[in-house]
Amino acid sequence: MRKSWKLGAVSVALVAALGLFGCSGGDTTEQKADKPAAPQTETQTPEAAEPESEAVELQIFAANSLTKAMAEAEELYTQQNPNVTFADTQYEASGTLNEMLGAGQYADILITASKGTMDDAAENGYVKEDTRQTMFNNDLVIVTKEGGDLAGRDISLEDIAAGKYTLAVGDENVPAGNYACQSLTTVGGYIEPDGATGADATGKGGEFSATLQPKVTLGGKVGDVCKYAESGEVDIAMVYTSDVYRMGGVAICSVVPNDTHKAITYPGAVCTDSKNAEAAQAFLEWCMTDEDANQIWEKWGFELAQN
C-alpha cells in the first residue's frame, strides 16, 4: 500500500514539472513567428567603395592663337573633372609645335591652326590619324593700332600690295602668315614658285613683290605680329579675329575675303606617344560638345567647326 502511494506521488510531481516548463521555458510556434530574428554573429562585409578616378595630367601643344581660350577651357575642365589636370601647355606657331614633336618632346594632344600643319604631323607619325577632327574656324583680318591714325579706315589687299602701309605677317612656320601670303597672291603682293594663287597657294616658299618686300616685318608667332601693330611699329598686321579678342590694343580695318586663302581651321588630335590617350580623347570630345566650353570659344572669337 505504501509502495503504491509513493509511485503516484512521483507521477504527480513529474506532470507538474512538465507543465511548469511549458509555461515558462519555451515559446509557442506563434510567439516564435512574432519574434524578430536574432542578429547574426558573423561579421558583415561592407560593400566596396567605388574606386576614385585615376589622376591624369595632360600635356597639350596648341597653336599660339589659342592661348587665352584654351587656358580658360582647361580650368573649367578640371573643375568638372578634378582627376584631370594640365601640364604647362605649350603655345607656339603650329610649325614650331611639329618641330618640337619631331625633336622628341612629349605631348598628349596637338591642336594646330591649319590643316596643312596637321597633315604634316600625321605624315610624320606624330598624331593618331583616327583621332583627328576639325575643332574651330577663324577669320583673317587686317588690324591697326587702336585709336591710331588708321583706325576706322577700310584697308584692302590692293592697298597693301601697292605698298601704302608697313605690314606685319607671320613667318612660314605661322599659319596666319601662310594665310596672309595666300591672300596676297591674288593681288600680286606675294609670288609663289609655281604661280599658284589664292586657296591653291601654300603661302610658303615664295617671295613678296619688290614693292611690298621693304614694307614687311615677319613675326615668329601670330601674337607677336599683333603686337607689332598694337605698338605702332608697323601700320597694319594680318592676324586672326580671335587675336583681336585675346591681345587687345588693335582695331579691325577689314576682314580678308575668305575666297582669297584656304579655309582657316584648327584640327586637333591625340599624339601617337600619348600615355593618356583615353583621357586626351575625352578632353577633345568635351571641347566640341560641352555648352560651357562652347561659350568660351565664342568669347575669344572662335567658331566651332561642323564636323
Predicted regions and their residues:
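Bacterial N-terminal signal peptides that target proteins for export
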Residues: 1-10
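C-terminal motif of bacterial Sec signal peptides marking the signal peptidase cleavage site
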Residues: 18-22
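Exported/periplasmic ABC-transporter solute-binding proteins
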Residues: 24-79, 90-95, 102, 114-115, ...
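Short beta-strand elements in bilobed, periplasmic/extracellular small-molecule ligand-binding domains
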Residues: 85-88
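Short beta-strand-centered segments that line the small-molecule binding cleft or hinge
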Residues: 108-114, 118-124, 128-133
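Short, glycine-/small- and polar/acidic-enriched structural segments
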Residues: 132-140
